[in-house]
């Protein structure tokens, strides 16, 4: 598996207490994946960490073989990764919900006009913004290289993950024009 087959799910913080617990900063929308016996990869290593105990109330986690404070300090600031395949199995989506990794690189259209492709997703509190890298033909016409479309029904009509396409309303091109 290559690096593109994995997704960041958490960052580990400082130790908490004396028994080896560390603060877990969830980088995903799925806290349910952090449970006893769940395993995660550490970037640039083949080492896997297995959860011995997870406390959802204070977002602390204890990993097997790191059950004392000195050993647990080695985990501070590490990023945990999960395979995309395992994420699909363990993280259940509701209707009209999508994984970030499925949205990224999708082409964005308004009717038959290709506006660009999604290069990032920003959380703005109550909603999300798709960061769109404009299609080269729009850049050549002096439109911005980057613009943002809110992930709201007013702007996004349909997302087709299998075709890697997002279809927008007429307001999407207005956003590009006025960015």
From Swiss-Prot:
GO cellular-component term (any): cytoplasm
Record bears the keyword Chaperone: yes
Alphabetical GO biological process terms: ribosomal small subunit biogenesis; rRNA processing
Alphabetic keyword roster: Chaperone, Cytoplasm, Ribosome biogenesis, rRNA processing
Superkingdom of the organism of origin: Bacteria
One Pfam family, short name: PRC
Domain PRC barrel intervals: 95-174
Subcellular location: Cytoplasm
Single GO molecular function: ribosome binding
Domain notes for this protein: The PRC barrel domain binds ribosomal protein uS19.
PANTHER family, sorted: RIBOSOME MATURATION FACTOR RIMM (PTHR33692:SF1)
Quaternary organization: Binds ribosomal protein uS19.
Job description of the protein: An accessory protein needed during the final step in the assembly of 30S ribosomal subunit, possibly for assembly of the head region. Essential for efficient processing of 16S rRNA. May be needed both before and after RbfA during the maturation of 16S rRNA. It has affinity for free ribosomal 30S subunits but not for 70S ribosomes.
Family recorded in the similarity comment: Belongs to the RimM family.
Name of the protein: Ribosome maturation factor RimM
Protein's organism: Campylobacter jejuni (strain RM1221)
Gene from which this protein is expressed: rimM
């Amino acid at each position: 598996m290559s690096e593109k087959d994995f997704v960041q799910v958490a960052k580990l913080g400082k130790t908490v207490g004396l028994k080896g617990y560390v603060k877990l900063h969830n980088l995903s929308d799925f806290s349910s994946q952090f449970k006893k016996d769940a395993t995660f990869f550490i970037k640039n290593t083949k080492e896997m960490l297995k959860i011995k105990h997870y406390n959802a109330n204070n977002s602390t986690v204890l990993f097997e073989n790191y059950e004392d404070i000195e050993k647990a300090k080695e985990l501070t600031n590490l990023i945990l990764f999960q395979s995309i395949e395992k994420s699909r199995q363990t993280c259940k989506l509701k209707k009209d919900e999508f994984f970030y990794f499925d949205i990224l690189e999708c082409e964005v259209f308004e009717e038959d006009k290709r506006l660009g492709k999604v290069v990032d997703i920003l959380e703005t509190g109550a909603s999300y913004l798709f960061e769109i890298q404009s299609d080269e033909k729009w850049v050549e016409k002096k439109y911005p290289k980057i613009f943002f479309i809110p992930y709201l029904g007013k702007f996004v009509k349909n997302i087709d993950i299998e075709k890697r396409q997002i279809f927008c309303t007429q307001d999407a091109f207005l956003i590009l024009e006025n960015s």
